[in-house]
């Protein structure tokens, strides 16, 4: 799977990751250009040992984006859903990279840029 994308809606990305986990064959992921936001989770979800990045690829991780509006109760519901999405992203990153949940939480707390060198890249 070749990736060059700024991400997208987390629910759409989760559907891709679910399908990657469903198929019985290995899934090779190759990053080039820009792989950002939730798309970096797709990169990390490739089969271990079959995740690659081109030399000048920009890989960026961040919190799932979203906003809240409406009544106080609606804002609380939306904020809880955003928190759930963040925990899902942390879990995916932790399970695919072997990093602790705390390390992944810190990595996702703000925009984090990863280099393409395999030993330095969390997603490799």
Feature-to-residue mapping (PLM):
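Glycine-rich beta-to-alpha active-site loop
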Residues: 2-16, 20-66, 108, 113
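Charged, glycine-interspersed solvent-exposed loop segments at helix/strand-loop junctions
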Residues: 67-124
């Amino acid at each position: 799977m070749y990736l060059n994308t700024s991400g997208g809606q987390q629910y759409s990305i989760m559907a891709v990751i679910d399908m990657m986990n469903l198929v019985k064959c290995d899934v090779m992921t190759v990053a080039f250009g820009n792989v950002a936001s939730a798309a970096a989770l797709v990169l990390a979800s490739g089969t271990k040992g079959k995740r690659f990045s081109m030399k000048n690829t920009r890989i960026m991780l961040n919190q799932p984006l979203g906003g809240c509006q409406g009544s106080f109760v609606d804002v609380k519901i939306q904020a809880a859903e955003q928190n759930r999405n963040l925990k899902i992203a942390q879990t995916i990153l932790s399970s695919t990279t072997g990093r602790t949940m705390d390390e992944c939480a810190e990595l996702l707390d703000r925009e984090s840029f990863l280099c393409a060198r395999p030993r330095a890249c969390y997603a490799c």
